[in-house]
Amino acid sequence: MAPKQKDDDFVLTLSDDENDAFNNFDVDGDDGDDGDELASSGTKKRKRDTAETTQNTSKKQKQQKPVKNGLKKNKKGQAETPAEEEQEEPQEEEDAGEDDGALDSDFEFDVGGVANTVVEGFDGWGMGNAEDEGAAKKGDKKAVDIDDIISRRQAKKEAAEAKKKKKQSEAQDNESWDGVAEDEDAESDGGMSVDFQDDELLAADGFGMGADGEDESDNEEAQDESGSDNDSDDDEEKDSEDDDDEAASDNDSVATPVGHPEDEASDNDSDAESEIDAEEQEKRKAFFAPEEEKTKEQADGAQRSFQEFNLSRPILRGLAAVNFTNPTPIQRKTIPVALLGKDIVGSAVTGSGKTAAFVVPILERLLFRPRKVPTSRVAILMPTRELAVQCYNVATKLATYTDITFCQLVGGFSLREQENILKKRPDVIIATPGRFIDHMRNSASFTVDTLEILVLDEADRMLEDGFADELNEILTTIPKSRQTMLFSATMTDTVDKLIRVGLNRPVRLMVDSKKNTSLTLVQEFVRLRPGREDKRLGYLLYLCKEIYTGRVIVFFRQKREAHRVRIVFGLLGLKAAELHGSMSQEQRIKSVENFRDGKVAFLLATDLASRGLDIKGVETVINYEAPQSHEIYLHRVGRTARAGRSGRACTIAAEPDRKVVKAAVKASKAQGAKVASRVVDPAVADQWAKKAADLEEEINEVLEEEKTEKQLAQAEMQVTKGENLIKHEAEIMSRPKRTWFESEKDKRAARKLGAAQLNGPDAGLSKKEKVKLSNKDKKRLDDARQRLEGKAGWKKGKAEREAPKPAKGKGKGKDKKKGKN
């Protein structure tokens, strides 16, 4: 009886049910009575097991009344499932009789079989998960909404205007009642003479009060003529000065045309770059793996589908779910090499699918990993938070039908939640360098000893001076025996830079490695003549109000300028969002989501958004001013015309931007891309610039109100922090202090180097640092200030010092003699 009691008490799990159902199938294909008896006995046993288990649970229901109803429902469900199985099993037995346990030889993977799960319009920003939404809502700072401030101010203005109109109407009513008396007074005063020469008695909008003198009207006509001349001059290309040379030769036949010094310097630089040093070629030959000769099938692009890479079915199903059917050139080259475990240095134009090029082989390799012990094996590093969030969304979509786990270590999100996820040892970690190092040094649950694959996306940016210290800290900590993959649209192949990453005979996979743009991109340039640089905002407002009215990204060099233009757009009724490093993570994600969903028409961003950001439907990119280098320009304009779609890029360029503009035009002409010059009427631009200038006072008031709200939010946060310190003092004090690998001084120096890479060496000169002055410097500054104020005393020169001095008391003696007489 004892063994029987054990069998009765045993509760089947889901896997046990599946094994029993599988064992009930007759593998030999006999549809005899034996199979029916086995099936019936199996179902009877399950009936008995479920009945006894429900009886055992019913005894406990008397003590647990709150969960009584739920258990009754489970009991009913358990009683109904065997009956359903009895009806379905005969059909399964008939199917199993014809199956020999192997797959049909004619079976093919049906890409269209997942048509119901295809994500239409997938762009990497589909944050539909509640987990992602909850993470996005947890910002470190309290957000201050500019739209709320502007709407409040406009509501106040409208209320004040309504009140003013009401008073005026009341005054007019009172005047109408007293009209008869006023007419009589006017008749009685008919013989009096009134002097109207006083300016205060005349209305400002009276007839003739706004008329200008003849000289002023002549000046305006002259300005209009010069404006039309400037308008006609804007038709010429950015890199040519032929019309100016012809005009100079007409005026002075002796003068010869002289090229612009910046043009000559850029020509010399391009010549120097084209002639690669023989020593550098030898270095590259020794550093990179030899390039394999292309077969005829590879040259013809024979691999037209992902199925020809021999990928696993869960990966193919995930690719079909996001509507990836045909591999791009960079994917065709990268996936076979990455599956072999080789190091890779890859480059391709923006929007060519570089993220999937390294995610797909990583997922394929992880499907064959040991599953007994969870281990973190892959680290993908990104330069910006938005790019890391986007890569995380793409990777999780591609791995939908696998058991591979992911974790994103991004600044701005909760450290505690990230530590809890790291305790589960996720397979793939997608991170920014700063937060990766933070967890590496301060989280006990995070170990990097098991990493097997390292990916650096936008690697040329990661190799710059701003990220050099952080990257070196990571590379010296993780294992050296790893696979390393570097990708970027402007990937460098200079050995001195790449050797720092610790690559082992990497394979160069350069697709469109000549720093080209997409062929579907139309590049436009608006030229600002010398002396009109202060009208730049007027040109931008005209373009956004009249020409490009929707799905536009506007790039700025500085956060301050982007924020100020954001306020101008709001005051002029243009729906815009901003994206830069001074915003909290909650605000940054909200801005991208609002722009992606079409709630705002313009995204005003710094170079934070220039790399990797993939938002579907971006029609236009406007450069408020040309960037520091041609590489940054390529990344900026690469936000549009992605994946074969068309797009436009418009750059407002002045004389300081000549070098970058010329490089862009030269590369585009060599590639065969379309380049055009857009002409904007200077008078129209001046009108918009005047509108922006008239809003200057209101802009400052909005900035002041925003500053006040931020200070209030900061004060509230400090109060909350103090309350938490008092309430949870023991827990907070018991936490170990977080450490960092460099001092504050080193961090400031790295920040300066990063700013210089983006905006040039003079980027930080406008903001002066506080330096303690010596007494000598103070005296020099005081003397200079006194001279400017005119208070400095007269100082004798050499001639005055050498002149004979008058005798002492000579004048006084004469006065004394006169007094005595």
From Swiss-Prot:
Motif DEAD box: positions: 457-460
Q: What is its EC number?
A: 3.6.4.13
Motif Q motif covers 304-332
Point to the regions of Basic residues compositional bias.
59-76, 807-821
Residues involved in ATP binding: 348-355
Top-rank taxon of the source lineage equals Eukaryota
Where do the Helicase C-terminal domain residues begin and end? 536-683
Could you say which residues form the signal peptide? Answer: none
- Enzymatic reactions: ATP + H2O = ADP + phosphate + H(+)
Chain intervals for the UniProt region annotation (Disordered): 1-304, 754-821
Q: Which GO terms describe its biological process?
A: ribosomal large subunit assembly; rRNA processing
For this record, the Gene Ontology CC terms, alphabetical, are: cytosol; nucleolus; preribosome, large subunit precursor
Keyword entries, A-Z: ATP-binding, Helicase, Hydrolase, Nucleotide-binding, Nucleus, Ribosome biogenesis, RNA-binding
Task: List, for all copies, the residue spans of the domain called Helicase ATP-binding.
Answer: 335-509
Similarity comment: Belongs to the DEAD box helicase family. DDX27/DRS1 subfamily.
Protein function: ATP-binding RNA helicase involved in ribosome assembly.
Q: What is known of its domains?
A: The Q motif is unique to and characteristic of the DEAD box family of RNA helicases and controls ATP binding and hydrolysis.
Q: How does it assemble?
A: Associates with pre-ribosomal particles.
State the name under which the record lists this protein: ATP-dependent RNA helicase drs1
Taxonomic path: Eukaryota, Fungi, Dikarya, Ascomycota, Pezizomycotina
